[in-house]
Amino acid sequence: MEKNLPDIFFFPNCVNVFSYKYSQDEFSNMSKTERDSFSLAVFPVIKHRWHNAHVVKHKGIYKVSTEARGKKVSPPSLGKPAHINLTTKQYIYSEHTISFECYSFLKCITNTEINSFDEYILRGLLEAGNSLQIFSNSVGKRTDTIGVLGNKYPFSKIPLASLTPKAQREIFSAWISHRPVVLTGGTGVGKTSQVPKLLLWFNYLFGGFSTLDKITDFHERPVILSLPRIALVRLHSNTILKSLGFKVLDGSPISLRYGSIPEELINKQPKKYGIVFSTHKLSLTKLFSYGTLIIDEVHEHDQIGDIIIAVARKHHTKIDSMFLMTATLEDDRERLKVFLPNPAFIHIPGDTLFKISEVFIHNKINPSSRMAYIEEEKRNLVTAIQMYTPPDGSSGIVFVASVAQCHEYKSYLEKRLPYDMYIIHGKVLDIDEILEKVYSSPNVSIIISTPYLESSVTIRNVTHIYDMGRVFVPAPFGGSQEFISKSMRDQRKGRVGRVNPGTYVYFYDLSYMKSIQRIDSEFLHNYILYANKFNLTLPEDLFIIPTNLDILWRTKEYIDSFDISTETWNKLLSNYYMKMIEYAKLYVLSPILAEELDNFERTGELTSIVREAILSLNLRIKILNFKHKDDDTYIHFCKILFGVYNGTNATIYYHRPLTGYMNMISDTIFVPVDNN
């Protein structure tokens, strides 16, 4: 359906759009087109003001029960009013008087076309809309937004490009068309921080109706923003909660969903029209209970995120609207054009608020000489930080490929530079405490991080990025370092320039950048299991198709060998992490074992019961040879003897030299097999 968003329904960005109440005199002076804009108010008014309302008589005047208290009465007959009183906002007949709003309430019945609304109906919708605070104007003040969504505090002032009137119109037209939408925009235009808020607003106003051409029944469903990591769920939900004028979750339109969520982060009074911030895995468990689906960080190609895209595309009639958000389409545009049915592409132009300077530091060593390349890189990094130093009280981020490199580079830098050094990555538990130190320090802070800081945490005093240009790509029983893609470069560079001018220092040749096909280095069992659950046809229905389909079919055969029913698999998918697919054999044995194994997957606490159960699976690994690494570490070169990757070589670190065999407990725990 082609619909333009009238100006009066813009979301208040508190820059050039403000919450506003229109007077009847203003309405009288409007053009017909401007007056007709108020016809769309019937949808939010029906949902949020007239639902379960009735006619009452208050001091002799017919009103809606949401306007005044009074005894429920039968409605009067309505013809053309004899007189209009703009001051009291009443229509006067010879036998009775009725409020503008009550007149509209009685006239706006199911199947009425909104283009048939006359001036009398529109005046009543104006009054009802004023009471709901759903209108906006280019004049006003921030405090006028208090109460719009039940908020005690005003909306934030947002000058970002995604909330300009032009962007709001474009996003609304795409949303109401029910076409899949691919939304891109430079870092800093407000994709993740503002677009979900805008879609929440549209959902509050118009969500749940099958058409905006006539009055119909509605089915209210929330919006969901699906994200790859818990840190992002917490970060973005808190940002939007505050920007909508709330200080607590309860009673707000914001809810969170992720595994083992603490009690204080559960909204006990959620709104039916609200927005749920969820990890990808939990999004999949109730995907069709949401009206608008937003998938963020699409360029990361998180496995479950890609599966959600495939499921939503297969069952697109069960979702009102789908938005895919990504910083860049460099790697995915052509695939999305083919994969999605008639997609709409929206780009929000704009850069970061402040200028970002780029500096290239050349590494004279070829990357094929890995150790020499890294040693030269570390020397270059010290020189670069000395030449391009964050101001006192500010910070810089060093992007390296892995957790091990975080420690290696921190140790190297601490010996050569007089600055405060910190490490942040996904397994660091006290990130908030570290950031407090960074923000309160009068000194220069250098943060060494994995790609985690590309998006998971915004550091407000960062002025410099030092990018090594690499990422560790995990693979079954191993992984490798790769040079980053353009989208990853854009994300890293965009960490600065938001609050102050920034500097992006990069240490890699741009010709080394390449697209990363993550599915070719992943365990594929989730693709099989979710395909079974949602009736996907493999491989055609997958967003990204594996290069080697033999592995996909071998994975399917391996899963079939477990002899677990599809119904049971679906329950396991909804309730457990199953970081190793073989754990499924244990989850189905007994509820007590399932509870302990689940606790192990969540907390790392390995009880003797769980240990013995996993050992009984005989996840055997053969040790081929080993070499001494340092004082308490030996590198073992091994071969996997089970599963889809039987015969694959693996490297395992252990605190003493081993021979023979070991059993795998998890991806980090191995138990030597007793040779006796």
UniProtKB/Swiss-Prot annotation:
Induction: Expressed both early and late in the viral replicative cycle. InterPro entries: DEAD/DEAH_box_helicase_dom, DNA/RNA_helicase_DEAH_CS, Helicase_ATP-bd, Helicase_C-like, NPH-II, P-loop_NTPase. GO terms for cellular component: virion component. SUPFAM superfamilies: P-loop containing nucleoside triphosphate hydrolases. Keywords: ATP-binding, Early protein, Helicase, Hydrolase, Late protein, Nucleotide-binding, Transcription, Virion. The keyword Transit peptide does not apply. Residues 366-535 form the Helicase C-terminal domain. ATP binds at G185, G186, T187, G188, V189, G190, K191, T192. It catalyses: ATP + H2O = ADP + phosphate + H(+). The keyword Transcription applies. Residues 172-347 form the Helicase ATP-binding domain. It is found in: Virion. Its EC number is 3.6.4.13. GO terms for molecular function: ATP binding; ATP hydrolysis activity; RNA binding; RNA helicase activity. A motif (DEXH box) lies at residues 296-299. Monomer. Belongs to the DEAD box helicase family. DEAH subfamily. NTP-dependent helicase that catalyzes unidirectional unwinding of 3'tailed duplex RNAs and plays an important role during transcription of early mRNAs, presumably by preventing R-loop formation behind the elongating RNA polymerase. Might also play a role in the export of newly synthesized mRNA chains out of the core into the cytoplasm. Required for replication and propagation of viral particles. This is RNA helicase NPH-II.
